[in-house]
A protein has these predicted regions:
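A recurrent flexible, glycine/aromatic-enriched loop bordering the glycosyltransferase active site
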Residues: 1-20, 33-36, 61, 70, ...
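Catalytic donor/gating beta->alpha subdomain of glycosyltransferases that bind UDP-sugars
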Residues: 29-94
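Short linear elements at protein peripheries
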Residues: 180-190
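Membrane-embedded multi-pass helical conduit in multi-pass membrane proteins
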Residues: 107-182
Length: 190
């Protein structure tokens, strides 16, 4: 992405919105249960019904990430909560980590590992399936890995290992969120 594009999540920490639009859509929803951590997604979905919401990739912010364990938990629960928003309208975001291609790439990692394990233990035919999911994963993240290789080549191996880890965590978070939705959890309690 080299220019602003339509997006679905209103990122309250760094976003701009006119007072008029904010009031028209009703602002943040106070009925969202505490701890869900998806008020930005829910507000964004209401904004895009009648207004344009853009993400400008030329804006950059500095991220201060917590430690590894905290980041792992945050990713898991964040994706789990996002799944409740997703199940409301079954729409992926147009870009970023909640886009369809990113989701498929992340989901392919645990499936790749599953087929690799089955192939090594039981039948090598599963190794073929393993490579299919490896290709899906690589296709989803190849631009990122090229960027790392160009800008921080010494970080490439760590970025691949971290991506494998966090893709798995994201996948398990999505599955957990789907299970929560199936048993009745919703973004807004009725």
């Amino acid at each position: 992405y080299n220019k602003p594009f339509s997006y679905e999540t209103f990122n309250g920490q760094i976003a701009l919105i006119t007072k008029d639009v904010y009031l028209k859509v009703g602002g943040y929803n106070s009925e969202i249960t505490w701890g869900m951590d998806n008020e930005n997604e829910e507000l964004g979905r209401r904004i895009i019904k009648k207004h344009k919401l853009l993400l400008d990739p030329t804006f950059q912010v500095k991220h201060n990430f917590p430690g590894f364990n905290k980041l792992t938990k945050t990713y898991f629960y964040r994706v789990s909560s996002w799944m409740l928003v997703f199940m409301e309208d079954m729409k992926f975001e147009s870009g970023g980590p909640a886009a369809l291609d990113s989701g498929l790439a992340a989901l392919s990692v645990p499936i790749f590992l599953l087929f690799l394990t089955i192939g090594l233990i039981f039948n090598s035919i599963f190794i073929i399936l393993c490579f299919i999911f490896l290709i899906i994963w690589l296709n989803g993240y190849i631009k990122f890995f090229r960027y790392v290789l160009t800008n921080k080549p010494k970080f490439l191996v760590q970025s691949i290992l971290l991506n494998l880890w966090f893709s798995s965590i994201i996948s398990f978070g999505a599955i957990w969120g789907l299970l929560r939705w199936v048993i009745g959890h919703r973004v807004i309690k009725s």
